[in-house]
Regions:
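S-adenosyl-L-methionine-dependent nucleic acid methyltransferase catalytic domains
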Residues: 1-167, 178, 195-291
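Core SAM-dependent methyltransferase catalytic element
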Residues: 122, 176-177, 182-192
Length: 291
């Protein structure tokens, strides 16, 4: 039997083919529904347009006046101010468009996934879903009603990933907004696997790095996922992720001696996962990876 099975397939279709009550751990990172919520993408285009025309540029005289107004003691921000008209440089217009896979995702679709998560997990199985911090209350309600309007996941807990090397967005304006990501954890019925004690559910790991062109825009740290898998499952258990992205959950499962089944709907990222596994002399098929 193959211990690692990955398909190029849509997530709902993939989950429906799994046996009910067969999964020990679902560890996943669905679209956060943030691309459509933000006006930042329009702002990014406007900034690029102004940069190209040179309309953002400032003069030496303007810098001197700006420096005096702000009380700056040195010229640390001078280059950015002269070129972009602001002290942060053009990075302040950080893009929040993660692609069609986020734009086309909906709360209704997420609800459909969560109901299937509950159905496929064994009693005592654990579900961990990373999601937008500002929408956690919505996620919590969906998890609590995964079976019926009054029945669903129990023991809902908060998991936090503190990034040790966050991008310095608006670093001189306010607290860093992108230094953490969060997940909610739920149990199907009772008696979950939990290989830890007195655990705060807070993890400190850096942003995952990788080869150019192979990183997913929302990729999670491999050691973080290995840690979560070891705490919430045992060796030989089945881990599932229907939003595989760059393949982190699959590699973390392989590294911790768990069985894994997952899928990725985006053809480009599925090919990236294939490329990563091919470095380990794995024989690959067009639409699946079996190890």
């Amino acid at each position: 039997m193959d211990n690692i099975q990955i398909k190029h397939q849509e997530g709902i279709e993939f989950l429906k083919n799994l046996d009910d009550n067969s999964v020990d751990l679902i560890l996943t990172d669905p679209p956060y529904l943030i691309s459509k919520d933000s006006g930042m993408n329009k702002f990014v285009k406007e900034v690029a347009k102004l940069d190209a025309s040179g309309e953002n540029k400032k003069t030496e005289e303007q810098w001197i006046a700006f420096k005096a107004k702000k009380g700056y003691a040195d010229d640390k921000y001078k280059e950015n101010y002269l070129k972009y008209g602001n002290t942060s440089g053009n990075k302040y217009a950080f893009k929040t468009d993660y692609g069609e896979w986020d734009k086309e995702f909906t709360i209704e679709k997420l609800d459909e996934f969560i109901k299937l998560f509950y159905k496929k997990l064994r009693p005592g199985g654990t579900c961990i879903i990373f999601f937008d911090i500002w929408k956690l209350e919505t996620l919590k309600k969906l998890m609590e009603t995964a079976k019926t309007k009054k029945c669903g996941f129990r023991q809902i807990r908060f998991v936090e990933w503190l990034k040790t090397n966050p991008m310095p967005l608006n670093q001189s304006v306010n607290y860093l907004t992108n230094c953490r990501e969060v997940a909610l954890l739920g149990i199907k019925k009772s008696k979950p696997t939990f290989n830890s004690k007195y655990d705060k559910g807070v993890y400190e790991y850096p942003i995952q790095t990788g080869k150019k062109g192979e990183r997913h825009p929302t990729q999670k740290n491999l050691l973080l996922f290995e840690d979560l898998i070891k705490k919430h499952s045992n060796e030989g258990d089945l881990v599932v992720d229907p939003f595989l992205g760059g393949g982190t959950t699959a590699f973390a499962s392989k590294n911790t001696n768990r069985r894994f089944k997952g899928c990725e709907v985006d053809e480009n990222y599925f090919k990236i996962i294939q490329k990563k596994f091919s470095r380990n002399n794995v024989v690959l098929n067009t639409n699946s990876i079996n190890i």
